[in-house]
């Protein structure tokens, strides 16, 4: 696992990737960092190489991704981590386009784990158009069309709120998913406002 910090206009975002895809994306200070990052490696974007791990760190990070300065991630010097770095570069490009007010028509590869139901919820969320807001009931109906049956709305709400890849999987477009006092809802409101102005 490789991680990085992306400096967005709304605050720092941590990203975690495997060779298979993006495994986590969360706003630092608002979302919890996944425990899966404990065995991650650090990559120096400026120097272009892996750095020896700091034994005090629980998750090591790539430095240098910055939406505001236009810095560009460098390629991995280690073939073992090259695929994960490529996933982070695609994620970085997606975030740059998004925060520039564009609606990216592609998503980076995903590797967010979970069961089939959680995957169905994430796929349903990916279908919510840029700038639109839906209800949990709408997401549940979309999930039902994919897996059959009528999923419990509470189960859909729980799966959506646990989605490890926020922003790219637009959890913020689901009205009423989080309570107003949940700090993540502040980020969701800001993301919806960004989409409304573009």
Feature-to-residue mapping (PLM):
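Nucleic acid-binding interface residues in structured DNA/RNA-binding domains
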Residues: 6, 102-198
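Low-complexity, small/basic-enriched stretches
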Residues: 1-106, 175-198
